Amino acid sequence: MTLSPHLPDKLTISLWDFSWYTRTGPGEPFADLDRAFEEAVTRGYNTVRICAMPFLLFGSRLDTGKLRPSGLGGAYGQRMRWYDVGGGGEIDGRAWLRELFEAALRHDCFVILSSWEYQQSPSFGEDRAWFDALMAVDPERRPEALADALADLIDFLVIHGLDDRIAFTELHNEVQGSRLTDGLEGQDKVVALRPRLERGIARFKERHPNRPVTVNYAKVPVGSLRGVPREVDVAVFHPYVYGVLDELLATFAIRDRGRPFAQEPVRRELLRPGAPDLADWTPPPGDRWRLEATTVGPREIYVHDWCDPDRWDAWLYDRYAMHRLAMEQRLTTWIEAAADWAAGSGVPLVFGEGWIGYTPLHGTFEEGPVGAAFCRRAVEESARVGAWGAVVCSNAAPQHPMWQDIALQRECNAVLRG
């Protein structure tokens, strides 16, 4: 597919994810969409990537006229990136989507449509109706349901004369790590998921044959790239290299539910004084359903909520030297492998997220000298292989502290633009 000539030669992408509708309360970063876009343009961005909540707005049959996004309940999750939702905002879902696109038009920006709905978006709902509606869809049909919802969403934008702001459409975010894989057998979810995704892409193309559509993948699934549907119009990957962060996660069994959680070591090495035990840190009873609606596990929420950010950062810095070369090599290898797949398939390449991994809200490892060096290295490599678009960093967005590092974002976006 030939991309529309009105789209930018390079997409400089800021990751607004679901935050553009969860963080709209007084004083929150998306209370004023014009200001958010103005700040993005000042930093060198021309594109934002969002969860457009397509299933909720166009597939669920739920009333979306008065959405009141919520956090995970009380203080639970309030020191986690993306989950520190203040609450207090109320939006008309479809009207807010239209306002986002109108603001994008005013600031000459573009939007990548996506969905996080089978990962965590419904955990921010006022109640569990959104989550239950998603889970009621047969797993074999979920990509097709998303395709229909996104097609309806685009029809809505066409009616309002705003569809030229769409850069491209993703059926879903990080598909192999989402509930799109429910019921699949085998270890290789990338390969096993391909038939479902192919049906979803085909369904979207039936509705909008001249609009680019794709899916995206966590990391770069080297060894499983045969599972990426050949019908995608854009190759999209998220090269999170982790490295030393993987060592931290493994040391304390933060994501490995098959091992006992390292309560005392994590308390001794990472947590703030007075932290409760993991078993005692839960959402209020009325909010516990939210843990079903997000793919982030209780251990990770607990450690992010209760870690001392300085101790977390120090733990990583103390061990980084042992991982530096491997992390740099992985980044380069993944970017080259992604570029090779895209070139072989004749489609443009985009890195929609990156580059190290998921760190606590107030941690600065990815924003500090190590992380900034990875941002520079990643955008240089992205430019070298001819990527159509990339982020500076997943954390370079209005909902994160890194937004204040204007100089780094301008520098990296200038490299991406060439």
Regions found by a protein language model. Give the residues of each.
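Active-site-adjacent substrate/metal-binding segments within catalytic domains
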Residues: 2-100, 326, 349
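Hydrophobic faces of well-ordered beta-strands that scaffold small-molecule active sites
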Residues: 9-17, 46-50, 111-115, 167-171, ...
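The substrate-binding groove and active-site-proximal loops of carbohydrate-active enzymes
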Residues: 16-30, 70-94, 130-148, 174-193, ...
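Short, solvent-exposed loop/turn segments at secondary-structure junctions
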Residues: 19-20, 54-56, 117-119, 173-177, ...
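An active-site-proximal structural segment forming one wall of the substrate-binding cleft
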Residues: 30-47, 73-117, 127-171, 196-207, ...
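Aromatic- and acidic-residue-enriched carbohydrate-binding clefts of CAZyme catalytic domains
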Residues: 60-94, 124-140, 263, 277-314
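Aromatic-rich peripheral "rim/lid" segments of glycoside hydrolase catalytic domains that contact
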Residues: 68-73, 361-418
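Extracellular glycoside hydrolase catalytic/binding regions
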Residues: 161, 177-383
